[in-house]
Amino acid sequence: MVSFDATEALTPYREGRGYGAILFDRERLRQADAGLFSPQRWGDRARPVDEGGRGGAWFVDAPFGHSVLRQYRRGGMAARVSRDQYLWKGAGRTRSFAEFRLMRELLKRKLPVPRPLAACYLREGLGYRAALLMERLENVRSLADHAQVAGRGAPWEDTGRLIARFHRAGLDHADLNAHNILFDAGGHGWLIDFDRGVLRIPATRWRERNLARLHRSLLKLRGNRTREDVDKDYERLHRAYELAWGRGY
């Protein structure tokens, strides 16, 4: 259950034949308009993010701080129908508003996630497009990068403990992969990309499903390393996870 937050602000807007709304953190943004979510509007201050994902993400040098802009994109077979349009089911169920509120709830629970700044949707007929703007984490590298460069020296145990912490809080991450786990030089870790994530009562089934997805992503990214090498590293991660889970953090 994501609680109400009085520091959120909501503003409607129209664009072309569509209409939408922007949900934003009024402690960080004095006002918000649709231009926040347009890389073209940012011009040279917006640079594409290369690693992971389906495109549609930019680093933005904004007056309110370094940020990341992500436009929601579909994958798989659904992308053949529409790359960036989703079926309208109500404002509260838009991908952007749901992720914005989930991230704010995780921050309230003292979990290491980027701070969301603003989310929007634009409805046209039965569909809508959406985008999310959040703080950028500085000087971090993904677990995918660590694994490819350092192999056995990657932060496997730290990753296991980090995931256990989120699972203890009830986060079911819909896309737990090696690109969505970040570490800085001091070993502090973060999770990112909470699209379709939900808070649940902790249960073995969904926790193991999250971990299995991460294992598959590590195998996919193994490069010249053998499957046996990857499995050994994952076992280190899993052991640390189980120990942290058993201790309650």
From Swiss-Prot:
GO biological process entries: lipopolysaccharide core region biosynthetic process
Enzyme Commission no: 2.7.1.166
Disulfide bonds listed in the record: none
Pathway: Bacterial outer membrane biogenesis; LPS core biosynthesis
Source species, domain of life: Bacteria
Main subcellular location: membrane
SUPFAM superfamilies listed in its UniProt record: Protein kinase-like (PK-like) (SSF56112)
Organism of derivation: Xanthomonas campestris pv. campestris (strain ATCC 33913 / DSM 3586 / NCPPB 528 / LMG 568 / P 25)
Gene Ontology MF terms in the entry: ATP binding; kinase activity; phosphotransferase activity, alcohol group as acceptor
Protein name: 3-deoxy-D-manno-octulosonic acid kinase
Subcellular location: Cell inner membrane
Topology relative to the membrane: Peripheral membrane protein
Keyword Cell membrane assigned: yes
Protein family: Belongs to the protein kinase superfamily. KdkA/RfaP family.
Catalytic residue list: 175
One Pfam family matching this protein: Kdo
Annotated function: Catalyzes the ATP-dependent phosphorylation of the 3-deoxy-D-manno-octulosonic acid (Kdo) residue in Kdo-lipid IV(A) at the 4-OH position.
GO CC annotation: plasma membrane
Keywords: ATP-binding, Cell inner membrane, Cell membrane, Kinase, Lipopolysaccharide biosynthesis, Membrane, Nucleotide-binding, Transferase
Catalytic activity field: an alpha-Kdo-(2->6)-lipid IVA + ATP = a 4-O-phospho-alpha-Kdo-(2->6)-lipid IVA + ADP + H(+)
